[in-house]
Amino acid sequence: MAKIQVILLEDVAGQGRKGEIVTVSDGYAHNFLLKGKKGVLATPEELQKIENRKKKEAKKQEEERNKSLELKKLLESKVLDIPVKAGENGKLFGAITSKEIASQIKEELGLDIDKKKIEANIKNLGPDEVHIKLFTDVKAVIKVNVIAK
């Protein structure tokens, strides 16, 4: 049985993930992968296309990482003042949520940050720190000052 190399265009159970080069029997390749548009023959042109796509993706990832590092510098250089209602002993009525912090960042700095990337657990008045995941390996720690209204 002849074996040929195929580049997968989508995830195929038992074979591999999208973009991988797999070696399969020619019958399986022609009757299932190629016919069902789940793969293409691994010709030099197709391999070059994949290589170019990977380079573009790596460049895009690096640009996003650099933007995240710049954003981290900006965020860490600022202190957010968040006015909230609080009881007599400095306890908040509830907690400050990531949504509130995201809206305060947008209001003060004009930056849109997804609330899901913000890790906040603030329940008292005074200074505190909030962690924001900007990229896979870039985290910003911003200073927050919670003040009573």
From Swiss-Prot:
Phylogenetic placement of the source organism: Bacteria, Fusobacteriati, Fusobacteriota, Fusobacteriia, Fusobacteriales
Keyword Nucleotide-binding applies: no
Function: Binds to the 23S rRNA.
GO biological process terms, semicolon-separated: translation
InterPro entries in alphabetical order: Ribosomal_bL9, Ribosomal_bL9/RNase_H1_N, Ribosomal_bL9_bac/chp, Ribosomal_bL9_C, Ribosomal_bL9_C_sf, Ribosomal_bL9_N, Ribosomal_bL9_N_sf
Gene name as annotated: rplI
Protein name (record): Large ribosomal subunit protein bL9
Keyword rRNA-binding in annotation: yes
Gene Ontology cellular-component terms listed: cytosolic large ribosomal subunit
Family designation: Belongs to the bacterial ribosomal protein bL9 family.
One MF term in the entry's GO annotations: structural constituent of ribosome
Keyword terms, alphabetized: Ribonucleoprotein, Ribosomal protein, RNA-binding, rRNA-binding
Superkingdom as given in the UniProt entry: Bacteria
